[in-house]
Amino acid sequence: MEVKFYDTVNDKLLKFAVVISQSNGKWVFCKHKERDTYEVPGGHREAGEDIFETAKRELQEETGAIKFEIKPICVYSVTGKNRVNDTGEETFGLLCFAEITEFAKELHSEMEKVVLMDELPENWTYPLIQPKLIEKYLRVESNSIIGATVTVTVDRPLGSYHPEYKDMYYPIN
């Protein structure tokens, strides 16, 4: 199984959307009714559907998310036979990230439940694919803060020491 990442590909090639999700600082995973494993929300693009709409629809259907912010991360591809690809040919999908702030009270999909986790699961439905997608997301996110300008407010008077860390001095310029 080979997973690759691209900035973009022809839109017609995108057949899947996967949405790495968090809620209140926890990872969001789905457990399918017919499996004892966990997976990231995602699924097939329907005929004539915009791929970003696929991502939003799958997130809503599989997690019950009703309030969320979602953004595209990159395009990924998978080469090799798996549960959703019996030919093994390279297939492409859109990888997104969502921060979910509200869930519906009930799920109305093939998912048995949604689980919020502090750590990534050990028993994945797609163990050769989805951990790599999360690794890519984490790399992209860490790169987005490196070199960023951060503005802070010092809440101590200049020329004083921090009350807990006596070696931390706020100099007067």
What does each model-found stretch correspond to?
Residues 45-69, 76-132:
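Unchanged
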Residues 1-18:
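Acidic, metal-coordinating catalytic segment for phosphate/diphosphate chemistry
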Residues 22-61:
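Conserved Nudix-box catalytic region and its N-terminal flanking loop in Nudix hydrolases
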Residues 135-139:
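Glycine-rich, aromatic-bearing surface loops/beta-hairpins
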Residues 10-14, 88-89, 146:
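A short catalytic or substrate-binding loop motif that flags glycine-/basic-rich loops and adjacent residues
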Residues 19, 72, 96-98, 150:
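A structural signal for short, well-ordered beta-strand segments
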Residues 15-17, 24-27, 92-93:
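Short, surface-exposed beta-edge/turn micro-motifs
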Residues 142-173:
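Hydrophobic N-terminal alpha-helices or hydrophobic patches in metabolic proteins across all domains
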